[in-house]
Amino acid sequence: MPELPEVETTRRGLAPLLEGRRVTGMTVRQARLRWPVPAGLPDAITGQTIRAVDRRAKYLLFRTPAGTLILHLGMSGSLRVIPGQQAGACAVPPGRHDHVDLRLADGSCLRYTDPRRFGSLHWCTGEPEAHWLLHRLGPEPFDTAFDGDRLHRLSRGRRTSVKAFIMDSGIVVGVGNIYASESLFRAGIHPGRPAGRVGLARYRRLAGAVREVLAEAIAAGGTTLRDFTASDGRPGYFAQTLNVYGRAGAPCPRCGRSIRQRRIAQRSTWYCPGCQR
């Protein structure tokens, strides 16, 4: 699943190609995604100019004067801009999993592809931050509202694992399975430790590790494991620097002990039994 760095990489690739462009039409070939594509979406967005391409958590926000298109890539979704197309339709024929085309006045086309169809498109005419998908989300990991003190305060009395705790989007957004494992390794915290038994100093270290890991992943263009490529088709390269994720049995880069794998909160988890306590 594309996580925050992958979605931010997509946003950065799309913004200069879409901002200031007028939408001339929308084709929906498959409306049955995680939630059905709103029947009125093509009419609502046609004629609108995309003012900004933003991100909130793992959602892309295409802001126009009339409303905001909120898009989630789901498990395997991707977006790419096909340049210089014929008027009225994308010149590149759609493939089996190309479900939505957004046509632009300069002849280009934004194409949404989703083999597993777990993504979604929504139209919001009010403040998108108040939309039911977004209004309960926690702070962004790079916001000043996110720090170790917040983690420590919200974790008191919680018996859930610290890994599940930092993956809770109500606590902080964008820390998915890959980056939770990597952040906990950097902070030296065992992923199965109860969240309420992690002290303030360690939470401050963990908050810093989360920011570092996510910033490095964004700079590397995300992590390509199976489905993800950036909007220009290039893979992400953060996978080349993973310390524990997906490395069961390999030596820890710090202490040399074998990386272990176990399921925590229904998710595969990797950690070093020597470095993480």
UniProtKB/Swiss-Prot annotation:
DNA binds at residues 97, 116, 158. Keywords: DNA damage, DNA repair, DNA-binding, Glycosidase, Hydrolase, Lyase, Metal-binding, Multifunctional enzyme, Zinc, Zinc-finger. Gene3D superfamilies: 1.10.8.50, MutM-like, N-terminal (3.20.190.10). SMART domains: Fapy_DNA_glyco (SM00898), H2TH (SM01232). It holds the Pfam family Fapy_DNA_glyco. Its EC number is 3.2.2.23, 4.2.99.18. It catalyses: Hydrolysis of DNA containing ring-opened 7-methylguanine residues, releasing 2,6-diamino-4-hydroxy-5-(N-methyl)formamidopyrimidine; 2'-deoxyribonucleotide-(2'-deoxyribose 5'-phosphate)-2'-deoxyribonucleotide-DNA = a 3'-end 2'-deoxyribonucleotide-(2,3-dehydro-2,3-deoxyribose 5'-phosphate)-DNA + a 5'-end 5'-phospho-2'-deoxyribonucleoside-DNA + H(+). The active site is at residues 2-3, 58, 267. GO terms for biological process: base-excision repair. One of its GO terms (molecular function) is damaged DNA binding. The keyword Oxidoreductase does not apply. Monomer. PANTHER family: FORMAMIDOPYRIMIDINE-DNA GLYCOSYLASE. Belongs to the FPG family. HAMAP family: Fapy_DNA_glycosyl. NCBIfam families: fpg, PRK01103.1. This is Formamidopyrimidine-DNA glycosylase. The lineage of its organism: Bacteria, Pseudomonadati, Pseudomonadota, Gammaproteobacteria, Chromatiales.
